[in-house]
Amino acid sequence: MPLYDPKTTALISIDLQGLVLGRALAPHSGQQVVDNTAAIATSLKAAGGTIILVTVGFSPDYADAVNQPADDALHFPEGGLPTAALAVPPEIAALTADVHIVKHHWSAFYGTEMDLQLRRRGIRTVILAGVATNFGVESTIRDAFAHNYAVIAAEDAMTSFSPEMHDFSCRYILPRLARIRKTAEIVTNS
């Protein structure tokens, strides 16, 4: 039995851009995540699926960024993010996404037209890939689940800032919300 119907499935690629890929990542390298995401996208697109590229972006004054007190809050450079931080790798840029969503928070659903874009395309299943497993990816998976989408998490097409962060999410949180699969299983749809 197939894992998904390509015609009603979208790959949602989270934050594959210099801002995140330039950091130390584990257990999978940024390049592994990019390569695996590209493999899933190529296979899904050839079968009639939808590709959604999600990047994070802010205005130069960060007026659209969440600015709540936190013990380990994010800090941004004055004057806006540099161009290199916003750039996506060539392997991802070459995929020609059907939709590009710019988000300002962890979840690709929060404050964006993600749900509208998925529903208008008849999408019922979403495949998640990207960085970081336990931040942007997990937040988007939680919201996809809450919006009643079937979710597949591409375990080796996502990563975090430590193996422990990635593993905790994949072992204890995501199995309650999604089917966890390797890239090879998703590409072969089995």
Predicted regions and their residues:
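Walker B catalytic acidic pair
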Residues: L16
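Generic, well-ordered alpha-helical segments
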Residues: S29-N36, Q68, G80, A84
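Short, solvent-exposed loop/turn segments at secondary-structure boundaries
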Residues: A24-H28, E164-M165
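Short beta-strand segments at enzyme active-site cores
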Residues: S13, G49-G57, D61-Y62, A154
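Active-site-adjacent betaalpha module
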Residues: M1-A10, A39-A47, D72-S190
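Short acidic, Gly/Ser-rich segments with clustered Asp/Glu that frequently serve as metal-coordination loops
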Residues: L19-G22
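Short, flexible, mixed-charge acidic loops at enzyme active sites
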Residues: A63-A70
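A short alpha/beta connector and helix-capping loop motif
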Residues: K7-T9, A26-V56
